[in-house]
A protein has these predicted regions:
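A beta-strand signature from Gram-negative outer-membrane beta-barrel systems
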Residues: 1-13, 109-111, 124, 130
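Surface-exposed loop/interface segments of Gram-negative outer-membrane beta-barrel transport/assembly proteins
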Residues: 5-95, 132, 136-216
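Short, mixed-charge, low-aromatic patches
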Residues: 67-72, 105-112
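Outer-membrane beta-barrel domain signature
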Residues: 100-105, 139-141
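Generic recognition of flexible, low-complexity loop/linker segments
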Residues: 102, 112-115, 152
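Non-cytosolic beta-sheet module surface loops
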Residues: 106, 117-118, 130
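Outer-membrane beta-barrel channels and translocator barrels
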Residues: 109, 120-121, 157-161
């Protein structure tokens, strides 16, 4: 940014832009519960010699019967109850699209810049500021990154032989997001554990946080 000059008329300039970004890679993830669970079990068996899920053959048969249901069919509910491990528990048989439930493909960005410069006979000045905001990928409770820049540049001629100058800068940024975990695990754990066979909310309205249907 150019500095102000002595005996210069005040000049104010502003520029800003708005843009929207989206992923350039494919987000066409597996949303059929049968295949999602089967793949997880296959790789866990190959590496850990134990399945990832605790689905029975009957569960997999039910998942197979539902594999083409884009939405829940009342005749083939996505959550049923069964007595296991000595208690009644939910068994998840869904075809759930976790990516589009958790994440938003559209990420808007706002950027505002203002600059003021000028000067008098003995003083030149320049003041500039910037505000930047970008929405993150989270859909339900959007995460947000914001940054603030501020700069003041002054030069004063006190005497012909004495000039005082200052250049002050300020920067602050923050990233606000919701969730129990840090930002790393907020993305890592759904990637590892949110099988398409699971749903986010139980029939009784409680959130699905942990389930005995997996080994995690």
């Amino acid at each position: 940014t150019k500095s102000g000059k002595y005996n210069e008329k005040a000049e104010v300039s502003y520029n800003g832009y708005f843009s929207v970004s989206s992923p350039t890679t494919s987000t066409d993830y597996e949303t059929r519960g049968y295949y999602s669970a089967k793949i997880a079990d296959f790789f866990m068996m190959a590496t850990q010699n134990t399945p990832y899920t605790s689905y029975t053959e009957a569960d997999y048969k039910a998942l197979w019967e539902r594999r083409n249901d884009k939405t829940e069919n009342p005749a083939r509910p996505w959550v049923v109850t069964d007595r296991r491990n000595g208690r009644q528990q939910y068994v998840y048989l869904a075809n759930f699209d976790w990516y589009n439930y958790l994440y938003d493909d559209s990420r808007p960005t706002w950027d505002h810049n203002i600059n003021i410069k000028g000067g008098t006979k003995a003083l030149s000045y320049m003041v500039s500021g910037r505000y930047y905001q970008q929405k993150g990928v989270n859909r339900i409770e959007p995460d947000m990154f914001k940054s603030y820049n501020f700069r003041v540049k002054l030069q004063a001629e006190i005497k012909p032989w004495l000039t005082i100058a200052s250049n002050t800068k300020f920067f602050q940024s923050n990233y606000k997001y919701y969730g129990y975990e840090d930002e790393y695990n907020n993305f890592r754990k759904p990637t590892l554990h949110a099988l398409a066979s699971f749903v986010p909310v139980n029939p009784d309205g409680t959130a699905v946080s942990h389930t005995s249907m997996t080994q995690s």
